[in-house]
Amino acid sequence: METLFNGTLTVGGRDQETTGFAWWAGNARLINLSGKLLGAHVAHAGLIVFWAGAMNLFEVSHFVPEKPMYEQGLILLPHIASLGYGVGPGGEVIDTFPYFVSGVLHLISSAVLGFGGVYHSLIGPETLEESFPFFGYIWKDKNKMTSILGYHLIMLGCGAWLLVLKAMYFGGIYDTWAPGGGDVRIITNPTTNFATIFGYLLRSPFGGDGWICSVDNLEDIIGGHIWIGTLCIFGGIWHIYTTPWPWARRAFVWSGEAYLSYSLGAIATMGFIACCFSWFNNTAYPSEFYGPTGPEASQAQAFTFLVRDQRLGANVASAQGPTGLGKYLMRSPTGEIIFGGETMRFWDFRGPWCEPLRGPNGLDLNKLKNDIQPWQERRAAEYMTHAPLGSLNSVGGVATEINAVNFVSPRSWLATSHFVLGFFFFVGHLWHAGRARAAAAGFEKGIDRVDEPVLSMRPLD
């Protein structure tokens, strides 16, 4: 009887007996075939870039400029818009052609990568060591592995510097904090102070401290990319021209599966950080494109009702709510004037539509009575009804309507997907790290199934 796990099955000219891996182990069959593994990696990159290009064009073809991006389920166009392409004051889309160009460039790139993947998978040499020693490698060659690490670091550093160059010299990027409701601007004075940039790493991850996710200005973001880009480039050069120190040779497991586990752990970490950034941060992820954060929607609702009732004659400074606390305004634990009601839990929220109304001691009563601008009212009303909540009951006081339009915020998509995928990658990290350590310690690979009870049972069919 043939089963899915039939060890005699041959795929791509390789079977379990000759490689030590069954067909479902995927690229494990190519561990020692550097040429074929190169093909698999290039083809994989082609698939990724193809998705980016195709999805980009899909979003462009469905995009309605009159509606906010976050109301249209878009996740790629907001990223391009954040880079300052095709948008003007207030985040209004004034030109979709750059988005089309981005999609086409990715499609063309994916074709090149796809061709390279097919070539190296089917036509090119199985191993690179003999014909192209510079590109060849042996997994246990510690010096070669750290050199490859160096090349990767240099590429990452160049990527970080591309954002710096775009922000400082090639048109600027979108700043949600620009006066009047956001605009594209050139970052002329990025923060390069070491204590400021790396101080983010020392912050608590809780509440308003928010670790690195609390960054609220583009100067710090671009300055951080200058630091990271420079460190990656110099770190890459260091790893290319040096050999691992004795402690590193002893501490790490040096095998293909170990490197896979390290990579999966790094990607999982980045996934978790991206999850928090896309959910909480409204500077790197401007709310004009991604929709409001949860706290932002809650604060926007409190602000909207304050504006409405103040126009109707309510004394918003002294009105009491049903609990005896301030209905519209109250004091924070530190004495600041904050919005009242359930949104009190988000008292340390900061957003560009709200900050102009603050004074030295929180919200300024005089500004609330005399200085509220129409764009602030419009934006708050829009954000109030587009909270990134998947709940039928109210969260943070945000009114939810079960008969309303089925709105799912891009922040919900991005945060959830990055957390779930980050978790899967973390499990993969643990799995492959355990296997790599076991192999390095000399344990027998796999499980001996000779005495497995199921082997003596009658087939189901």
Swiss-Prot record:
Propeptide: 1-2
Alphabetical list of SUPFAM superfamilies matching this protein: Photosystem II antenna protein-like
Coiled-coil stretches: none
Listed GO MF terms: chlorophyll binding; electron transporter, transferring electrons within the cyclic electron transport pathway of photosynthesis activity; metal ion binding
GO terms for biological process, alphabetical: photosynthetic electron transport in photosystem II
Residue intervals passing through the bilayer: 57-81, 122-143, 166-188, 243-263, 279-300, 435-459
Modified residues (N-acetylthreonine): 3
Source species, domain of life: Eukaryota
Residue numbers binding [CaMn4O5] cluster: 355
Subunit structure: PSII is composed of 1 copy each of membrane proteins PsbA, PsbB, PsbC, PsbD, PsbE, PsbF, PsbH, PsbI, PsbJ, PsbK, PsbL, PsbM, PsbT, PsbX, PsbY, PsbZ, Psb30/Ycf12, at least 3 peripheral proteins of the oxygen-evolving complex and a large number of cofactors. It forms dimeric complexes.
Task performed by this protein: One of the components of the core complex of photosystem II (PSII). It binds chlorophyll and helps catalyze the primary light-induced photochemical processes of PSII. PSII is a light-driven water:plastoquinone oxidoreductase, using light energy to abstract electrons from H(2)O, generating O(2) and a proton gradient subsequently used for ATP formation.
Family membership noted in the UniProt record: Belongs to the PsbB/PsbC family. PsbC subfamily.
Protein name according to UniProt: Photosystem II CP43 reaction center protein
Organism the protein comes from: Chlamydomonas moewusii
